[in-house]
Amino acid sequence: MARGGAGRAVALGLVLRLLFGLRTGLEAAPAPAHTRVQVSGSRADSCPTDTFQCLTSGYCVPLSWRCDGDQDCSDGSDEEDCRIESCAQNGQCQPQSALPCSCDNISGCSDVSDKNLNCSRPPCQESELHCILDDVCIPHTWRCDGHPDCLDSSDELSCDTDTEIDKIFQEENATTTRISTTMENETSFRNVTFTSAGDSSRNPSAYGVIAAAGVLSAILVSATLLILLRLRGQGYLPPPGLLVAVKESLLLSERKTSLI
């Protein structure tokens, strides 16, 4: 009888040890990870609110797997429309934070909701230049300065064409200026010439010069005539034609002097 009691005690101890070991093993085992759960039936929105339902297969995946850069649905529907996705699967938008989230493509909100905002930059000012691809405004004075300031280098495009156009405009302006200056100079010269010719008869100094020239001409002709007469008296007769020409010149000079 004592042997039977000892056997039962040994068996009970073995059972307790087995139960204790099983309990320890269960506690040490890792917690099960999130797994895909296939929904029975194809009814839409049959997944829990904290999961996302794949469009084609109907699997329910954790909502945190949505737009994480890894396709968890076979059709990739969990990675579609991620740029403008700002609300949860159930249509409830994320709560607003105390400070507004910025549209700088850098996560500044605790829920990373500003990464999914469909933002647009305000237009550039009149003194600024809009870069084509990177959507940035830079000062207009930076255009064609030999250094690309836009990421796409659009501020340094078509600079040669603009330079040639500026040169053409400058050359045309210079030519127009030269023509205008030449015409003004010619007009001024003509006005001065006409004024001098028109006012000579009314200018006392010009009148005196003309009168002096007439007197000198008469004296010169008279001296020439006297020389010819002396030569004739000495027997050196000049040709008759020369004497007649001298007399006519003397008469012409006297007429001019009388007209003045």
Swiss-Prot record:
SUPFAM superfamilies cross-referenced by the UniProt entry: LDL receptor-like module (SSF57424)
Topological type in the membrane: Single-pass type I membrane protein
Cellular component GO terms, alphabetical: endoplasmic reticulum; plasma membrane
Domain LDL-receptor class A, first and last residues per copy: 46-83, 123-160
Disulfide cross-links: C47-C60, C54-C73, C67-C82, C124-C137, C131-C150, C144-C159
Binding site for Ca(2+) 2: W142, D145, H147, D149, D155, E156
Keywords: Cell membrane, Disulfide bond, Glycoprotein, Growth factor, Membrane, Metal-binding, Repeat, Signal, Transmembrane, Transmembrane helix
Residues on Cytoplasmic side: 230-260
Molecular function as annotated in GO: calcium ion binding; cargo receptor activity; cobalamin binding; growth factor activity
Subcellular location: Cell membrane
Chain sites annotated for binding Ca(2+) 1: W65, D68, D70, D72, D78, E79
Classification via InterPro entries: LDL_receptor-like_sf (IPR036055), LDLR (IPR050685), LDLR_class-A_CS (IPR023415), LDrepeatLR_classA_rpt (IPR002172)
Keyword Membrane: yes
Chief localisation class: membrane
TM stretches of this protein: 209-229
Record's signal peptide: 1-28
Pfam families the record matches: Ldl_recept_a
Glycosylation sites noted in the Swiss-Prot or TrEMBL record: N118, N185
GO biological process: B cell costimulation; cobalamin transport; positive regulation of B cell proliferation; regulation of vitamin metabolic process
Stretches assigned to the Extracellular side: 29-208
PANTHER family, per database record: CD320 ANTIGEN, LOW-DENSITY LIPOPROTEIN RECEPTOR-RELATED
Subunit structure: Interacts (via LDL-receptor class A domains) with TCN2.
Function, in words: Receptor for transcobalamin saturated with cobalamin (TCbl). Plays an important role in cobalamin uptake. Plasma membrane protein that is expressed on follicular dendritic cells (FDC) and mediates interaction with germinal center B cells. Functions as a costimulator to promote B cell responses to antigenic stimuli; promotes B cell differentiation and proliferation. Germinal center-B (GC-B) cells differentiate into memory B-cells and plasma cells (PC) through interaction with T-cells and follicular dendritic cells (FDC). CD320 augments the proliferation of PC precursors generated by IL-10.
Protein name stated in the entry: CD320 antigen
Gene coding for it: Cd320
